[in-house]
């Protein structure tokens, strides 16, 4: 598959807990006239019930690099709050015309953010 770059607009955002207890985010992006894809979907943490001596207690788990990942997305798009993302023009790099968004970029600057590369760098110690 060949990569392609398109101009797009962030049409919707989600930051919240899925029904199975995982904290996730997604940016919905319209691009190339009829294409709409989501960017993100990765888990930041989880909440779950743990039975401790016959009593259910809600436990929370944070995953590494969560705050940095969110901040890198905001920096890339050029905003300071999650709420400002909706309506912003961006560039998207996809693995095909209607495929997965693999990176999101600033509309004017040569500034990109790729989630998979971000985690690979963190895991390798760079």
Region annotations inferred by a language model:
Residues 1-126:
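Short beta-rich binding modules
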């Amino acid at each position: 598959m060949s990569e392609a770059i398109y101009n797009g607009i962030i049409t919707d955002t989600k930051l919240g807990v899925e029904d199975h207890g995982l904290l996730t985010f997604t940016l919905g992006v319209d691009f190339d006239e009829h294409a709409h894809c989501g960017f993100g979907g990765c888990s930041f943490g989880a909440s779950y019930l743990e039975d401790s001596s016959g009593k259910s207690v809600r436990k929370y788990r944070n995953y590494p690099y969560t705050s940095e990942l969110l901040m890198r997305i905001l920096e890339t798009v050029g905003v300071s709050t999650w709420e400002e993302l909706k309506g912003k023009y961006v560039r998207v790099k996809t693995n095909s015309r209607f495929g997965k968004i693999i990176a999101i970029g600033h509309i004017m600057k040569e500034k990109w953010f790729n989630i998979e590369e971000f985690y690979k760098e963190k895991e390798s110690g760079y």
